[in-house]
Amino acid sequence: MADMQNLVERLERAVGRLEAVSHTSDMHRGYGDSPSKAGAAPYVQAFDSLLAGPVAEYLKISKEIGGDVQKHAEMVHTGLKLERALLVTASQCQQPADNKLSDLLAPISEQIKEVITFREKNRGSKLFNHLSAVSESIQALGWVAMAPKPGPYVKEMNDAAMFYTNRVLKEYKDVDKKHVDWVKAYLSIWTELQAYIKEFHTTGLVWSKTGPVAKELSGLPSGPSAGSGPPPPPPGPPPPPVSTSSGSDESASRSALFAQINQGESITHALKHVSDDMKTHKNPALKAQSGPVRSGPKPFSAPKPQTSPSPKPATKKEPAVLELEGKKWRVENQENVSNLVIDDTELKQVAYIYKCVNTTLQIKGKINSITVDNCKKLGLVFDDVVGIVEIINSRDVKVQVMGKVPTISINKTDGCHAYLSKNSLDCEIVSAKSSEMNVLIPTEGGDFNEFPVPEQFKTLWNGQKLVTTVTEIAG
């Protein structure tokens, strides 16, 4: 009975796909996709079925949700259309050399970057989990360059999306079914693509054995919906007419120049002889009299390429992050922010603060541990930590505990101020390879007394072992 039910479900899915191909052609073309021609290769026709099925459903639901999700979906659709164009090209042409192949793949690569950039530019979006699911998996479009296992690569990207789609399901499961359907439609694109690859491109994109070597993408959709740019601007105005008077002057100058050249060797008769006392290298006194030499304009020369053996690449600014990933709070690449707050904390959670500059962060509640890594001018205020607060590879860091913390570890850090509360006076301060460390103890009046952590030590051999003691700097 169960087998019969499964068979019925499979038949229903097959019928639904056929209906999508036959009855949604208008909608399909409305999104800018050209329908398969009768002579198209089987794997191009199969890809069109994917576009007409799960992709069309994903676009439809994204349009219903609207906003950033709809905009993102349109970018994804453009990438899929570019991929279709590559498939058409591969079905008609032979595979080019690697350097030419990269040119064919460039439009798809650029579209992938655009999808990812859109997520980074809209971190404040209410639909950020939707954008993240797409951004983390859109690189699946790169399967065309993956050999010999493009299918597993797509599955890996699909799994990356599920981390965020699970968040969408958790948030909207009992609120809005439309978002649940969106998750199913989007993930089905990649599962269907895996099946498609397994059937037609198991070990990599299949190219034609005949025809010309591919030079450019074929089968790109036409019209404004194809994602192409605006038409080129009209040509500029023609150049102004040439002045006849200036032309005659130039002609006269040119004639005079040729007349001088035609003199041949006799032209040197007008040159003046230079005696030794007029030469600066024979008469040093001339150098002192002449003063600084003014150089005339340099003749034009084509710019020469830089010959530096190791040019430094431009520094790429990483996006700022403040999010909960599993049980880890990630606070990364924050700059010049003074009001960061994490208040939805649990005992099993940890906080990892990385590459933050001139930033203040407050962590409320009780968490397991905090790590500060590679930060500069960071101010950290926290309530309670049951494990350890670790500061490593940082400069000019100030931490203040409002409740209790058992251990503060300072490693490879220059400049650290630790403000303790009355409940954390028994805190252990463990330091290594660090300098300018101070512990501040609260007073009855509400102020703090500052005590430096020793940095200079004296070690002696007592006959049996090394004995190390703290030394004070004299003077």
From Swiss-Prot:
<feature type="modified residue" description="Phosphoserine">
    <location>
        <position position="295"/>
    </location>
</feature>
<feature type="compositionally biased region" description="Pro residues">
    <location>
        <begin position="229"/>
        <end position="242"/>
    </location>
</feature>
<dbReference type="Pfam" id="PF08603">
    <property type="entry name" value="CAP_C"/>
</dbReference>
<feature type="modified residue" description="Phosphoserine">
    <location>
        <position position="301"/>
    </location>
</feature>
<keyword id="KW-0472">Membrane</keyword>
<comment type="function">
    <text>Directly regulates filament dynamics and has been implicated in a number of complex developmental and morphological processes, including mRNA localization and the establishment of cell polarity.</text>
</comment>
<feature type="modified residue" description="N6-acetyllysine">
    <location>
        <position position="81"/>
    </location>
</feature>
<feature type="region of interest" description="Disordered">
    <location>
        <begin position="216"/>
        <end position="255"/>
    </location>
</feature>
<dbReference type="InterPro" id="IPR001837">
    <property type="entry name" value="Adenylate_cyclase-assoc_CAP"/>
</dbReference>
<keyword id="KW-0007">Acetylation</keyword>
<dbReference type="GO" id="GO:0005737">
    <property type="term" value="C:cytoplasm"/>
</dbReference>
<feature type="cross-link" description="Glycyl lysine isopeptide (Lys-Gly) (interchain with G-Cter in SUMO1)">
    <location>
        <position position="348"/>
    </location>
</feature>
<keyword id="KW-0009">Actin-binding</keyword>
<dbReference type="InterPro" id="IPR053950">
    <property type="entry name" value="CAP_N"/>
</dbReference>
<dbReference type="InterPro" id="IPR028417">
    <property type="entry name" value="CAP_CS_C"/>
</dbReference>
<keyword id="KW-0488">Methylation</keyword>
<feature type="compositionally biased region" description="Low complexity">
    <location>
        <begin position="218"/>
        <end position="228"/>
    </location>
</feature>
<dbReference type="InterPro" id="IPR017901">
    <property type="entry name" value="C-CAP_CF_C-like"/>
</dbReference>
<dbReference type="GO" id="GO:0007015">
    <property type="term" value="P:actin filament organization"/>
</dbReference>
<dbReference type="GO" id="GO:0000902">
    <property type="term" value="P:cell morphogenesis"/>
</dbReference>
<feature type="modified residue" description="Phosphothreonine">
    <location>
        <position position="307"/>
    </location>
</feature>
<dbReference type="InterPro" id="IPR013992">
    <property type="entry name" value="Adenylate_cyclase-assoc_CAP_N"/>
</dbReference>
<protein>
    <recommendedName>
        <fullName>Adenylyl cyclase-associated protein 1</fullName>
    </recommendedName>
</protein>
<comment type="similarity">
    <text>Belongs to the CAP family.</text>
</comment>
<feature type="modified residue" description="Phosphoserine">
    <location>
        <position position="308"/>
    </location>
</feature>
<keyword id="KW-0832">Ubl conjugation</keyword>
<dbReference type="GO" id="GO:0019933">
    <property type="term" value="P:cAMP-mediated signaling"/>
</dbReference>
<feature type="domain" description="C-CAP/cofactor C-like">
    <location>
        <begin position="313"/>
        <end position="453"/>
    </location>
</feature>
<dbReference type="InterPro" id="IPR016098">
    <property type="entry name" value="CAP/MinC_C"/>
</dbReference>
<dbReference type="GO" id="GO:0008179">
    <property type="term" value="F:adenylate cyclase binding"/>
</dbReference>
<feature type="modified residue" description="N6-methyllysine">
    <location>
        <position position="287"/>
    </location>
</feature>
<dbReference type="InterPro" id="IPR036222">
    <property type="entry name" value="CAP_N_sf"/>
</dbReference>
<feature type="modified residue" description="Phosphoserine">
    <location>
        <position position="310"/>
    </location>
</feature>
<feature type="region of interest" description="Disordered">
    <location>
        <begin position="278"/>
        <end position="318"/>
    </location>
</feature>
<feature type="compositionally biased region" description="Pro residues">
    <location>
        <begin position="300"/>
        <end position="312"/>
    </location>
</feature>
<dbReference type="InterPro" id="IPR036223">
    <property type="entry name" value="CAP_C_sf"/>
</dbReference>
<dbReference type="Pfam" id="PF01213">
    <property type="entry name" value="CAP_N-CM"/>
</dbReference>
<dbReference type="InterPro" id="IPR018106">
    <property type="entry name" value="CAP_CS_N"/>
</dbReference>
<feature type="modified residue" description="Phosphotyrosine">
    <location>
        <position position="31"/>
    </location>
</feature>
<feature type="modified residue" description="N-acetylalanine">
    <location>
        <position position="2"/>
    </location>
</feature>
<keyword id="KW-1017">Isopeptide bond</keyword>
<feature type="compositionally biased region" description="Low complexity">
    <location>
        <begin position="243"/>
        <end position="255"/>
    </location>
</feature>
